Amino acid sequence: MPKRILQGVVVSDKNEKTIVVNVERRFQDPLLKKIVRRSKKYHAHDENKSAKVGDIVKIRECKPVSKLKKWEVFTDEA
């Protein structure tokens, strides 16, 4: 099974080697036929501490690094 890759904006980089990425998805509501935006935050492992708040990054699934971190930084610029 291929690893999932998501793109989002870094909202926090205060932790050591961890960033929080806000990923937004858009879909059409089946009943109202209206475009709806939903967002979710993911904790991602950033080994080089290269991502800063406001950067657009791509993250990919990996084996669990800790309780919350199951994603890693794939590329810094999307």
Curated annotation (Swiss-Prot):
Name of protein: Small ribosomal subunit protein uS17
Gene Ontology cellular component list: cytosolic small ribosomal subunit
Alphabetized SUPFAM superfamilies for the sequence: Nucleic acid-binding proteins
Summary of subunit composition and partner proteins: Part of the 30S ribosomal subunit.
InterPro entries recorded: NA-bd_OB-fold, Ribosomal_uS17, Ribosomal_uS17_bact/chlr, Ribosomal_uS17_CS
Biological process, per Gene Ontology: translation
Record's keyword terms, sorted: Ribonucleoprotein, Ribosomal protein, RNA-binding, rRNA-binding
Protein role: One of the primary rRNA binding proteins, it binds specifically to the 5'-end of 16S ribosomal RNA.
Single GO MF descriptor: structural constituent of ribosome
Record keyword Ribosomal protein present: yes
Family: Belongs to the universal ribosomal protein uS17 family.
